């Protein structure tokens, strides 16, 4: 998907079966549906090793991989195929990780599109700086407390699935209640803990919303003790973690989160329009409508009575 940001679908020689079987929620496949007609180069997915034989059959000039867990795996694939293997990274966080900029720079160099790579890196910096500039000077005591639930962790999960040091909250300098645990990355919390925190605003990943809704039907009493539920302060964000991060969607989510938490600082932002601006700048085409069709888009969630 990083290569898709170069807006040249004809550079691809093959596609993994996993991409064809699970296209939902992947903006790069909405933007370039023709990619699903490419020859299959293996099963794909995080648990399958690359299929050297099938890769060889499509005669690529270079193999980009993000799932080579170590140098040895990349070297082995290069040895088997005789084709240069280049290892890229999405980094550790969902947005604005320096490793992404490094990866884009490397791709640009290899495919002869260094100018586009520079433009992409500059765009990432621009979004990061804009989000930070809007929010960094807001005093802590003026910020609502926030919580994100329903985050995917190798599959969809309910409201207890969250993150400490959550990069989208960090992008808008939000007060993440989970940060007081000192834990980072994916965390499963107890419902009792959520009642204790009682965050002002709750965000739910749309991919996890069905699990949250099921749980709500079973445990209405728990949900109804939460202030955010009582006051209608539950909001849906678009899922961005399908077979690693869709950076475009994550940035769009960060703008929506900013708008919900600090309406004054984001007065000029219409989240749907901003999402399409981001998709257009990175992928070359607006795909928010398709994401919204699949997941319901950015919205306030009203739990049934």
Question: Which sequence ranges carry the predicted segments?
Answer:
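A short, structured surface patch at a secondary-structure boundary
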Residues: 1-57, 62, 67, 177
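Short, structured coil segments at secondary-structure junctions
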Residues: 8, 80-82, 172-173, 230
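Short hydrophobic/charged patches on amphipathic alpha-helices used for structural packing
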Residues: 52-56, 166, 191-192
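Periplasmic-binding protein-like
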Residues: 63-66, 201-205
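A ligand-binding cleft/hinge motif common to bilobed small-molecule-binding domains
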Residues: 69-80, 206-218
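Alpha-helical scaffolding within the catalytic cores
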Residues: 72, 91, 133, 187-193, ...
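Extracytoplasmic substrate-binding proteins
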Residues: 73-154, 178-179, 233-304
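Alpha-helical, coiled-coil/dimerization segments enriched in small aliphatic residues
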Residues: 157-185
């Amino acid at each position: 998907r990083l290569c898709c940001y170069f807006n040249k679908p004809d550079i691809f020689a093959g596609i993994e079966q996993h991409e064809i079987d699970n296209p939902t929620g992947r903006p790069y496949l909405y933007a370039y549906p023709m990619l699903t007609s490419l020859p299959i180069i293996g099963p794909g997915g995080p648990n399958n090793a690359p299929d050297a034989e099938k890769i060889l059959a499509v005669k690529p000039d270079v193999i980009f991989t993000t799932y080579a867990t170590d140098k040895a795996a990349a070297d082995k694939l290069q040895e088997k195929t005789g084709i240069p293997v280049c290892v890229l990274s999405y980094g550790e966080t969902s947005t604005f990780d320096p490793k992404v900029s490094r990866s884009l720079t490397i791709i640009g160099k290899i495919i002869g599109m260094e100018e586009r790579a520079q433009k992409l890196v500059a765009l990432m910096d621009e979004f990061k700086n804009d989000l930070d500039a809007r929010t960094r000077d807001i005093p802590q005591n003026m910020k609502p407390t926030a919580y994100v639930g329903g985050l995917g962790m190798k599959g969809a999960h309910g409201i207890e699935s969250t993150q400490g040091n959550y990069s989208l909250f960090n992008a808008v300098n939000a007060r993440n209640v989970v940060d007081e645990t000192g834990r980072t990355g994916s965390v499963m919390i107890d419902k009792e803990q959520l009642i204790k925190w009682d965050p002002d605003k709750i965000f739910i990943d749309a991919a996890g919303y069905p699990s949250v809704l099921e749980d709500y039907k079973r445990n209405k009493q728990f949900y109804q003790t939460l202030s955010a539920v009582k006051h209608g302060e539950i909001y849906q964000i678009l899922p961005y973690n399908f077979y690693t991060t869709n950076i475009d969607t994550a940035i769009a989510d960060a703008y929506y989160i900013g708008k919900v938490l600090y309406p004054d600082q984001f007065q000029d932002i219409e989240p749907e329009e901003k999402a399409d601006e981001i998709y257009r700048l990175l992928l070359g085409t607006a795909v928010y409508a398709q994401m919204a069709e699949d997941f319901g888009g950015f919205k306030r969630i009203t739990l049934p009575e």
